[in-house]
Amino acid sequence: MGKSLIQQRRGKGSPTFRSPSHRFRGAVKYIPLNYTQDKTIRGVVEEIMHDPGRTAPVARVKFENGMEKLIIAPEGLLVGQEIYIGPDAPVEIGNTLPLAKIPEGTYIYNIEGVPGDGGKYVRAGGTYALVVSREKDKVIVQLPSGELKAFDPNCRATIGVVAGGGRLEKPLVKAGKAYYKYKARNKFWPTPRGVKMNAVNHPFGGKEHHPGKPTTTSRRAPPGRKVGHIAARRTGRRK
């Protein structure tokens, strides 16, 4: 009898595959919209911390209304620095404003997809987006991928570039460093290829080191057979 595939084990939900959220600093979201829709709130950066669950550092900010929030730290943010959230906030690093109030050509990050959702786009270390143009009912933003996306002018974003850039410039060099990199987030690593497994572990397994059968499979295949190119229209190079 064969053994369960990795994706079958993952679907069971055992601790091996669960995210260790108890190690993470917490959710990073903007202050609810009803607090900052008509007024600007001042906050002070109390601490900048490493977050194992992110590629960027986070900052703990205490606001004048008594709320404490975690924000994604931009490059150049300092402990003790004052930041502002609201429609009248100055266009300076670390401040959060509606897209309608941000000039064209400004670097921004942590952009809301829908007004009030707390920030969804451009949150990884070293990333930034660019305000390209604006129209009456939308603002065009260039995302890190180069895609131009239209946002509601009331969506909020933070001025600056996310800290933590250059993280991938230093090579890992050895497998031991990769081990600790993945262990921090409880990632299943290493992940062997199916053709390198024994026949009992994978449909492509065995000692031939090639699949030995077509790599395309049906969308309706049973879980233990659903590997390879699932419901593929074509495989290989385009002709």
UniProtKB/Swiss-Prot annotation:
Region Disordered, annotated ranges: 1-20, 203-239
GO molecular function terms listed in the Swiss-Prot or TrEMBL record: rRNA binding; structural constituent of ribosome
Keyword Nucleotide-binding (UniProt): no
Biased composition (Basic residues): 222-239
A Pfam family assignment: Ribosomal_L2_C
Superkingdom per UniProt: Archaea
Entry similarity comment: Belongs to the universal ribosomal protein uL2 family.
Free-text function comment from the UniProt entry: One of the primary rRNA binding proteins. Required for association of the 30S and 50S subunits to form the 70S ribosome, for tRNA binding and peptide bond formation. It has been suggested to have peptidyltransferase activity; this is somewhat controversial. Makes several contacts with the 16S rRNA in the 70S ribosome.
Record's protein name: Large ribosomal subunit protein uL2
Name of the gene encoding the protein in the UniProt record: rpl2
